[in-house]
């Protein structure tokens, strides 16, 4: 039997939106993933430390208060410096201020090193599908 995909999940920065985080935690766990949920109000270092402690395969960052772009800057570089080079980075939610063209938002987050970038309202099934595609040996 294949090892479960290990995920670190949390809400970055000063964002305290907990309901979506709990829904993601439940849905991903039910789908067979091993989820470490660091909760809300989480700085980048908490994601990195949890990923190191759990030997995570991916970090899933959520943000709903619109400041995700600021909060996520430098995360890829910090992951690399901490020994997590190549860890998959996912981000989703209301990750920028105001209504912006999502193609442009996607480009900016991809340039920051994120592997998957999701707009508000993305079904969790999309993330699950992407996780299985990224880790076919664990599906």
Curated annotation (Swiss-Prot):
Gene3D superfamilies: Cobalamin-binding domain (3.40.50.280). CDD domains: Glm_B12_BD. GO terms for biological process: anaerobic glutamate catabolic process; glutamate catabolic process via L-citramalate. GO terms for molecular function: cobalamin binding; metal ion binding; methylaspartate mutase activity. Residues 4-139 form the B12-binding domain. Its EC number is 5.4.99.1. It comes from the Bacteria. Pathway: Amino-acid degradation; L-glutamate degradation via mesaconate pathway; acetate and pyruvate from L-glutamate: step 1/4. It catalyses: (2S,3S)-3-methyl-L-aspartate = L-glutamate. Belongs to the methylaspartate mutase GlmS subunit family. This is Glutamate mutase sigma subunit. The lineage of its organism: Bacteria, Pseudomonadati, Spirochaetota, Spirochaetia, Spirochaetales.
